[in-house]
């Protein structure tokens, strides 16, 4: 036995010396280390001299010690090995690491029937060191220690002893110290190492908060809450939480709460707050770095919170500190006043110096002077402006209802956001004299064979200055004589005229200062003698003529509709363009009309050799097979470009082959920036492939859901404009897509959207009213126009309806249209007049365009050319996108009103968050203490930001959802 132990010791310690130490977590404080003590501990054995024995071996000129026991042939055993008394110190839970080896009982002669392969570990707490007084009853069993590997006979022949490492923990400890004891019950064991330690969470500096070294707790499930302190020049942000972390039993820091931020004038540099350098500033408590002082500011000292403006420059209250200081603009440049009767048109050019700002507006004031007295004063309120005279953004305005024979002086002042901070004004003036009244507006009231009844009108403010009106009339062609009638009224009947004769009539106002402006010369004709006697007959004939003209016009209109592309606007709908679209130079050819689809492929596509294509990884599965990302060698062979590769699966049917090649024949005819580009096909080898350009961001609907809330409205509208441009191109080629949806739009790395997936697409005939009737195939109900669902007929107008749904998908970041409604419910709702509600933060102009796309009558929907034009105008005028459509979160954010069939509100916070697709924030709510619906409904907008919801779109979605959630909770009477 002893010979085996000595031999095992040598081999075992060789393996032990090479074994790496177990990686420890947290900071370990060692209380006892048998291996490091070098045999000087002198542990107590019981019974003395019969069981455990301390053995020594020499390795690398160093003594190696271990306790071993191997009384396997002597019947039942009860051998104890007790450590010295160990002072606990501040430890509450201790960890015990054992390294040992156990010999296989079958390696002994006869199998040693009493042999065991385990031993027991005990501990006892005490406030005193009992010395050599050993009492078993004081010890409590920790565990039975069993090896993972035992050393068998063949291991001895190979001089390899298998080392086991086990770790146990004990706690909480309450006495001053403790003993450990090892009980042998008949095993052959060598104990090489006993290491006892406890754990601390180390001192930590995180998020500009310092956390002290903390002793790990004794109870595994619990976490010790530790308050942190902000580093110098860092503070808890307003409304934020004090920094806290939790020290786990294994010495790891967990669950950080709160944070510190550098105060104004300081920025974060590594783990400290450093004062802003001279010439830099930081004006708030935030994570942002110090900013360089903007233009027209004075150099700032170290640690500045702002930069003072240079003399003559200012900062408006609403200006951010990072904005350069600015000054008022110079006066408007080149002001002109052009008189037009009783109107004056004022025009000017912008100031040559804008003061560094773009918020320039203009104010127009008017002063009138009486020529007789020379007195001047503000213009009377009766003067009218074509638009409000204050806050003008345009550089022209028309002033009307001016009085005749009056001098006017107009002042145009340029102002910007800092003009109110100075007393000086930047203006330019122009004067004009009004010498005449506005010309009368003349109309014919009635006529006979010998008379004409004429009336006229002038603006009311001028009527008081007119004392009479002069009517001049003469026969057309007679320049030698004329007649004059004067009257104080606004009408006159000219008698004694020749029948069936044309007269030239002019009316002029007369004032005390002289003649006013004359009206236009009008031509009026008296009736012929025959015409007056047969008026009824003529009236009847006129009615017939009008009816014939209407019928002829209707026939001509129908002929035009059949000949040209269908024009879908109605006479009273001026929202869309009325111009006729020209026929495209190129018309789409349906590959299915070819007897052999290979002919269409040869005509419209490029055949690629398989050696030029490399498939790299599967990125999806299509209708015909798998879709790969790969590379395509260019014609020069020197460059490879990324491509998407669509394959035709093995075992395909003839119809699948024809449809697969047909899709390639379709794509090969298109060439547009917003249509997916076909690189070529492999049709002569298997598997057949369609190679297209690679779109890095994939399908639009999935991409938007992943980037929820990250884009500006202008970026979203730009995406829609690209899709509309692609569809305009298809429509101009007489092509109907039939499956336009966000899932069939692909997005590249530059956010360019391209129309793809032409599997359901079909061609329109030359007839602009042509449709395509399906053969019973599936129709994407949520995206399809009602007439296409009901009659299985598709037109470009039905594609416009689908585009409206795509607009809604984009503005909602990939929401499912009509949410959880079934297809049957969707069709019923549409036929009942329901339309998808306003998306959150959707510009009014965009939602109006959606509603136009969803007109029940397809003839009233816009064309894609109209849509592109409208979107272009909105993009060129971004301010037009700032007006948001009315938004009702209870409708526009689809919230199930209850959870479960019994009408009970959401039972859990996670269930509610999942219903609004915000489940990624579940842990944020839990960590911040919002663990129940009753707590959630009390949250404010600041609370939502505080728990870590950073994206504005997500903040609004949760906030709007809370409105409906509060209603639900109040309805069922849950107290909040």
UniProtKB/Swiss-Prot annotation:
PROSITE patterns, A to Z: EGF_2, EPH_LBD, FN3, PROTEIN_KINASE_ATP, PROTEIN_KINASE_DOM, PROTEIN_KINASE_TYR, RECEPTOR_TYR_KIN_V_1, RECEPTOR_TYR_KIN_V_2
UniProt EC number: 2.7.10.1
A single GO molecular function term of this UniProt record: ATP binding
Catalytic residues, chain numbering: 739 (proton acceptor)
Hydrolase keyword on record: no
Signal peptide positions (record): 1-23
Residues annotated with Phosphoserine modification: 570, 579, 869, 892, 897, 901
Record function comment: Receptor tyrosine kinase which binds promiscuously membrane-bound ephrin-A family ligands residing on adjacent cells, leading to contact-dependent bidirectional signaling into neighboring cells. The signaling pathway downstream of the receptor is referred to as forward signaling while the signaling pathway downstream of the ephrin ligand is referred to as reverse signaling. Activated by the ligand ephrin-A1/EFNA1 regulates migration, integrin-mediated adhesion, proliferation and differentiation of cells.
Protein name: Ephrin type-A receptor 2
